[in-house]
Every structure is written in structure tokens, then in C-alpha cells.
A protein has these predicted regions:
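Bacterial N-terminal signal peptides
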Residues: 13-23
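Solvent-exposed loop/turn segments at secondary-structure junctions
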Residues: 42-47, 77, 83-88, 123-127, ...
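Surface-exposed, active-site-proximal loop segments in enzymatic domains
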Residues: 47-55, 84-101, 123-138, 247-249, ...
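Extracellular glycoside hydrolase catalytic/binding regions
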Residues: 55, 59-60, 143-147, 151, ...
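An active-site-proximal structural segment forming one wall of the substrate-binding cleft
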Residues: 58-76, 94-123, 128-160, 174-189, ...
Length: 366
């Protein structure tokens, strides 16, 4: 389809982006755009068994061209998975300067293209294998890393804090306590960044009301989450294969995505909360493509409770045969799913981060 030149699009996006940081008008918010649409750019979390590993041998960070490609495709949000142990090699210790330099460069590259960057601690609720809240990794260890990150990116509205990727092997009640402690630690630094709060059970939308090992569910345990600035959303993941694991390319039906989001959407509305679909993916076949279009269309129709989405995944180091990989081909051509994602992202971000306007404005901290 016709496109602006790269330079014109970049200038337009940056102007709109910085206009947002100076405050979105209520008239803009009323256009009901989702606001956030993008992709997970993997690489920094690769070779997770190698701690810390060697940069650009075991793991890598996205190149500047990665941001430009997805920005030109209409996206405005990058979710950046990173390993906690690389960011903070020692519990309660300083953040690693090499990793922080890479993170700061990632933020700068995202902002240069008018994009938001989600820092995703991609650790599944553990640190060096120790469950958050357990004897090896007390909650104070978890709050420490977020306190340090909050100080580093304090009130940079381009940076979104993703507390933890897919917590598991932890009850919803235990996780709710850890998440609340992290929110408290972040706000104590006076940072007003948007926070994404996942649930237990790999934060599946389909399993939001399922009991964990102590009988509590995300639907019950997380209703009490409190942010004094009310600048947060609940992060969920939802894949379209039979068991929602994202390990297979086959989709059950064209309505499977909508069916699995429906209860969570109802929960958001009943509890006056906001949601963010931070991971989802499907293979390129007719049923999956229909399911993908239907699911993202459903989110757009329920913009009163959904803030946005980020596809899983892209990144230069993904095998080109990986079914969910939307990183461009070596010849520069697009992966098939981009024919669905790009126009939907462009429409969703027509008012940059309009969803952010539905989060109460930050009041000066006293």
C-alpha cells in the first residue's frame, strides 16, 4: 500500500510522539485509538543458561535498523526482553554498566523513531533459579532491581516497566504480594512510568480465573493491586494453539483468540482495570490468520479496557523457519503475518498512545 517516505514518516512520528509527552488533549483521547501496538524484539534474553554470557556471541540487542523497520510498518512499541541476572549479576548489587549502556541505547533508538520501549524482565518469576519470595530470592531482591531501574529511567514516558515475564510456580496470592512490593518500590523513587503487571500461571488470559496451588487465582488476588498514580495495566499473554503454550503453529478455530480473551476482558471491565496483550503469536495459515485478525479486532472494539499489544516475536537471531518470526527476510521482504499486523498497528496508533490519555494524569508528588 502507499507509504510516506522513511524520512517523512520518521519526522511525523517524532512530532506526534513529543506532542504526547507534552500532554494529549481530551479530544484526541476520544478518537478511541488503542495507542500501543508493536512487537517483541528478542535477543538480549537469549542463551539464558549462560550468565552473564558474552554480548554479541551468546546474546544481542536490537540494531537501529530494527526499530526503523517496525516503525515504518506502523508500530510504536517495542517490548525488549532482558535477563535479570545480566542486568544485576549480584542480588542487591549495582546494575551492570554494560547492560545499562545497552538499555539506554535501546531507549534512545526507540525514541528516535517515536516509539515506546517496554523493559521486560524475562525471568519467569525467578532469579538464578530461586522463586521470588522464596529463601533464595526474597521479595526485597525483586524490589531492589526495580528501584534501581526506576531511578535510571525515572519518569521517562517512553519507557514502560514490565515487572516480570510469565511468573510461574508461584501462587497468585504470592505473586500479587511481590508485584505490589515492586510497584511500591518504583513509586517511592518518584518515577511515574507506566507499569505492566502480569499474573501467575504464565499470565495467560485464558487462565486468569484458574486457581493456582493455594486456590487463589489472578482474578481474585490481583484485584487489590494499588498504584498511587494509577498508571498501570495488567499484562497477559495469549497464544492460539490447543494448549495456549505457543509451541505449535496450529490454531483451533478462527474464533479461538476472541474466545480466550473474552473472560479476561469482562474482568477488566467489571473491575475498572486496563489490559495489555504483551505476547501472542500464530503461524501463517488461513485459520490462524483469521483468528489473529479476529482477536486484534476484538481488542480494538474493546478499547475502553485494552491499551495495546506486542506480537511475539522478532529479532535478527531468530531462525527464519520459526513460525512466529516476523523479522524481515534477508532480501528485505516482509513475513506474511505483517500483512495483518502492519495495517492494524497503523490504525491502532493513529493517535500515539491515546490509551495513555485514559490513565489519570500524573500529579506532582509532594
Amino acid at each position: 500500500m502507499p507509504r510516506l517516505s522513511n524520512s517523512c514518516l520518521k519526522v511525523a512520528r517524532c512530532c506526534l510522539y513529543f506532542a504526547l509527552l507534552n500532554g494529549i488533549s481530551s479530544a484526541q483521547a476520544e478518537t478511541r485509538a488503542l495507542g500501543f501496538a508493536g512487537v517483541n524484539l528478542s535477543g538480549a534474553e537469549f542463551a539464558s543458561s549462560k550468565k552473564p554470557g558474552i554480548l554479541n556471541k551468546d546474546y544481542t540487542y536490537p540494531a537501529s535498523s530494527d526499530y526503523s523497520y517496525f516503525s515504518n510498518a506502523g508500530m510504536n512499541t517495542i517490548r525488549l526482553p532482558v535477563l535479570w541476572e545480566r542486568l544485576q549479576p549480584n542480588a542487591l548489587g549495582e546494575l551492570d554498566p554494560t547492560q545499562m549502556a545497552q538499555l539506554q541505547l535501546a531507549v534512545a533508538r526507540a525514541k528516535a523513531w517515536g516509539m515506546y520501549l517496554i523493559i521486560d524482565i524475562h525471568n519467569y518469576g525467578k532469579y538464578y533459579g530461586g522463586k521470588i519470595g522464596g529463601p533464595q530470592t526474597p521479595i526485597s531482591t525483586f524490589t531492589d532491581v526495580w528501584r534501581r531501574l526506576a531511578k535510571a529511567f525515572n519518569s521517562d514516558n517512553a519507557v514502560i516497566f514490565g515487572l516480570m515475564n510469565e511468573p510461574n510456580n508461584i501462587s497468585a496470592r504470592e505473586w500479587a504480594g511481590a508485584a505490589q512490593a515492586a510497584i511500591n518500590a518504583i513509586r517511592e523513587t518518584r518515577a511515574n512510568n507506566l507499569i505492566l503487571v502480569p499474573g501467575a500461571l504464565w499470565t495467560g488470559a485464558h487462565s486468569w480465573d484458574k486457581p493456582t496451588n493455594d486456590g487463589s487465582s489472578n482474578a481474585t488476588a490481583l484485584t487489590s493491586i494499588y498504584d498511587p498514580l494509577n498508571r498501570y495495566a495488567f499484562e497477559v499473554h495469549q497464544y492460539l494453539d490447543a494448549d495456549s503454550s505457543g509451541t505449535r503453529g496450529v490454531c483451533g478455530s478462527s474464533t479461538v483468540g476472541v474466545d480466550r480473551l473474552r473472560k479476561f476482558t469482562d474482568w477488566l471491565r467489571a473491575n475498572r482495570k486496563l489490559g495489555f496483550l504483551a505476547e501472542f503469536g500464530s503461524a501463517n495459515d488461513p485459520v490462524c490468520n483469521d483468528a489473529l485478525s479476529e482477536m486484534l479486532g476484538y481488542i480494538e472494539k474493546n478499547v475502553d479496557v485494552w491499551m495495546g499489544w506486542t506480537w511475539w516475536a522478532a529479532g535478527a537471531w531468530w531462525n527464519s523457519s520459526y513460525a512466529f518470526n516476523v523479522y524481515p527476510n534477508k532480501d528485505g521482504t516482509n513475513k506474511p503475518q505483517m500483512a495483518i499486523l502492519s495495517p492494524l498497528a497503523t490504525r491502532a496508533t493513529r493517535v500515539p498512545a491515546a490509551a495513555a490519555a485514559r490513565v489519570p494524569r500524573v500529579q506532582p508528588l509532594r
